[in-house]
Amino acid sequence: MQKMSEKPLYRAAENPTRNADRRAGRFEEEELISKTGRHPDMVIQFQDDADDQHTSHYEGNWRHYFHKKLHIKNRLIRDWLSESLAMFLFMSLLLGGAATAHFTGKQDDPMLTAVFHGFSAVFGIYVGAGVSGGIINPALTFAVALLGRVSWRKCLVLVSAQYFGSFIASAVVYLIYYESLQNYAKTADDNGEFLQKTAGIWSTFPKPYLSMTGAIFNQIFCTMLLSIGFLSISDHKNFRPTKGLFPFAVGLLIMTVFLAFSYSAGAAMNPARDLSPRLWSLIIGYGNEVFSHNDYKWFWIPWLFPYVGALFGAVMYQIFVGVHWPDKQSTKR
C-alpha cells in the first residue's frame, strides 16, 4: 500500500507541471463556457469567439488603417459574412464541377461527382471554420443548434448566409459558363433537350421510376448518415481529427455518402445546395418545370427532408453515443 501511494507523489515531484496541465485541460471546457458563453463542443468553433488582436507591425501603416476601418465588431455580422463566403466558395466549386461534368458527358459518373462534392466542401469549410464554423449546410446547422452547440439566433444567421451564398454562386457560375451553355444549346433539339440535359447542373432530380415515398426516405436517410458522421467528427469527446484535418474528414464523409446513395435521387443532403440554384435556374429561363417536375412532387423533398434527416441523426447520435460519455470531472473511462 505504501508503494502505491508513493508512486504518484514521486511522479508529481519529478514533473510538477504535467499533472497541473492535465488538471487544467480537464476543466478547459468549463473555463471557455464561463468566458465566452459558448459551448466548446465542436472543432469548427475553435476561433469563433476569440478577441481580435492587432499585431504591432501593422500599427501605423495602411494595413492597420484598412483593418481598423473595415473591421466589424458585431459577432453575428462577422458570422454571416464568413458563412456567406464559405458557402459561395463551396457552391462555386460544386456547380462548376457539375457544369464541367455535363459538358463532357460525365454527369452520370458517380465517382467524379462524389469527388467534386467532397472537395468543394473541404475548401468551403476551410474558409469559414475559424469565424462562423463553416458548416455550409442549413440542415446540419439546425442539428448543431438542436444540440446546443450554437445558439438559435446564430443558427438563423448562418442559414440565411448559406442560402445567400449558394444563390450568388449560382449566378456567378452561370455568367462564367454562359458562352459554354449557349454553345452546348446548339447541339440540342427544339424539344427542350437542352433544358433537360442541363437542369441537373443547378439542382437535383430523381430517376423517373422513383416514387415520392422512395424519394423522401432517400433524402432522410442520406442526411441522417451525414448528420451522425458530422456530429461524431466534431464531438470533442470523440475520436475527432485535428483542426486542420477536420474539413478533409467532412469532405470524405460527403464523398462516401454520395457514392453510396446518390443514384436514385442525387443525395442533395443540403437544402441550400438545392433550393437556391433551383430558384436561379427559374430566373434564367428554365421555366416552372424546375419546380413542377413530377407534378410538384419533388422540389420540396430535397429542401424539407434533409432537415428531418439531420434531426433524426442528431437524436440517434445523442441516444447511442452522446449521453453516455463520462462526467467531465471524472477521470475514469
From Swiss-Prot:
Aquaporins contain two tandem repeats each containing three membrane-spanning domains and a pore-forming loop with the signature motif Asn-Pro-Ala (NPA). Belongs to the MIP/aquaporin (TC 1.A.8) family. The chain crosses the membrane at residues 85-105, 116-136, 156-176, 213-233, 245-265, 303-323. InterPro entries: Aquaporin-like, MIP, MIP/Aquaporin. This is Aquaporin-1. Induction: Transcript abundance is medium and expression is slightly down-regulated in the inactive stage (during anhydrobiois). It is a multi-pass membrane protein. Gene3D superfamilies: Glycerol uptake facilitator protein. It comes from Milnesium tardigradum (Water bear). Aquaglyceroporin that may modulate the water content and osmolytes during anhydrobiosis. A motif (NPA 2) lies at residues 270-272. A motif (NPA 1) lies at residues 137-139. GO terms for molecular function: glycerol channel activity; water channel activity. It is found in: Cell membrane. SUPFAM superfamilies: Aquaporin-like.
